[in-house]
Amino acid sequence: MAGTPGHPIFLLLLLRAIGQVSPYSTHWKPTWPAYRLPVVLPQSTFNLAKPDFGAEAKLEVSSSCGPQCHKGTPLPTYEEAKQYLSYETLYANGSRTETQVGIYVLRSGEEQSSGKSRRKRQIYGYDSRFSIFGKDFLLNYPFSTSVKLSTGCTGTLVAEKHVLTAAHCIHDGKTYVKGTQKLRVGFLKPKFKDGRGANDSHSALPEKMKFQWIRVKRTHVPKGWIKGNANDIGMDYDYALLELKKPHKRKFMKIGVSPPAKQLPGGRIHFSGYDNDRPGNLVYRFCDVQDETYDLLYQQCDAQPGASGSGVYVRMWKRQQQKWERKIIGIFSGHQWVDVNGSPQDFNVAVRITPLKYAQICYWIKGNYVDCREG
């Protein structure tokens, strides 16, 4: 594998997608860019002491470091990037490990080898969220990819047995939250299998739904979150992957590298979550991206605690398959009050899936890098 650690050009290749193809070229359609991606591989794994699972679950994360603050932060060095992308794995029996990683760029031809207290408002003006009712919507794609965590957050199905969510939903930066050892993922389904007792199909009332729960086998959390939660670098790594004990048998949404905001269709993002002010309801929303940094998307989508961990997605044209495709390009993290030219302004924040994060998450899902070369 190629790459000279610490070399500035090498670092630039790691942090920026390699060989990006213009998303538009001769096509009028907003098209998924083609990327040649870096590789994130485990180098060593060692056992850690069992955690105490003593943290209180937080349904949102706040930070005072806004877009300008993040834009002024230096890019991580190669060694720092390796530290941030190293990760902890928690197993259902309470044991855990730490895995240190290496980061590489493949040579051509190698790819075929194996502050002040404020009341936080997350509703901006008129509440533009939509509660999704009826099994014809809730049980069909893309809404069916949204699931509920037993800790109170939202997650998104990204593979046959995997759920993407926010790290703070299971870990507070110091230890795991209460209930994580017996973490479950809930799938909405009709309350009545045969329809008896359910609302009549012509009724104006929404059909009653319930959650069916599946236990989690193991979780992965990047060390960038665990090491950095005490400062503002942590929010850049507020994501986690959950592996279920059995397949969920539903259609899932693939992850993708987040394009620049100006390349998103209409500059807009979408996500659905289980906001805690509408218990039992799946809530969908969309809005424009207001600002961005390399790791974060700043927007003012209406959201409440409980929506944290929702997969942020867009729909773009897939040139190779000649079809439209939705992909998860970020994870909804939480809320920020920031000072903009001396005036307070608030944003909702999503963690972008960068090329390095894509390589890491994809490896967690696939278990190899060969299947993780297309973002």
UniProtKB/Swiss-Prot annotation:
GO molecular function, one term: serine-type endopeptidase activity
EC top class named in words: hydrolase
UniProt signal peptide: 1-23
Any single biological process term in GO: proteolysis
Protein's UniProt keywords contain Coiled coil: no
Any single Gene Ontology cellular-component annotation: extracellular region
Localisation: Secreted
Disulfide partners: 153-169
E.C. numbers: 3.4.21.-
Protein keywords: Disulfide bond, Glycoprotein, Hydrolase, Protease, Secreted, Serine protease, Signal
Active-site residues, Swiss-Prot/TrEMBL: 168, 232, 308
Gene3D superfamilies (alphabetical): Trypsin-like serine proteases
Superkingdom assignment: Eukaryota
Glycosylation site list: 93, 199
PANTHER family (UniProt xref): SERINE PROTEASE, SERINE PROTEASE 23
Similarity comment text for this entry: Belongs to the peptidase S1 family.
Name of the protein: Serine protease 23
Organism: Bos taurus
